[in-house]
């Protein structure tokens, strides 16, 4: 059985090969989430955004507004704690075509409520 992160990386590559408008934005976690597979396959469409979760969302919405399909790759804890307001205000309320990929959520991946609360 493949690790979930390998499936994620392989899926991003398949999406990128199928559609030239697919971009992957990463929050400095490509090795951990295996988004680096997309970076190797489609380097011109891989954007390393660094650790700036709120800005990460804004950039993705801007790219979506001009026809790209951004796929965001980040740890779940950062989506739920650092970027929930921009997700609600910029993505959900505007119906932006932005895809969220949140890795390592839950006790099985080492991120329990006691560690993030």
Where does each model-flagged region fall?
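Thiamine diphosphate
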Residues: 1-117
């Amino acid at each position: 059985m493949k690790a979930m992160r390998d499936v994620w990386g392989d899926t991003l590559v398949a999406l990128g090969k199928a559609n030239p408008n697919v971009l992957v934005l990463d929050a400095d976690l490509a090795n951990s989430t295996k988004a680096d597979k997309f970076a190797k396959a489609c380097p011109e469409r891989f954007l390393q955004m660094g650790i700036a979760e709120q800005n990460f969302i804004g950039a993705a919405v801007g790219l979506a507004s001009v026809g790209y399909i951004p796929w965001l790759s980040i740890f779940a804890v950062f989506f739920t704690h650092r970027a929930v307001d921009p997700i609600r205000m910029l993505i959900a309320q505007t119906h932006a075509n932005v895809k969220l990929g949140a890795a390592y959520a839950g006790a099985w991946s080492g991120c329990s409520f006691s560690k993030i609360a």
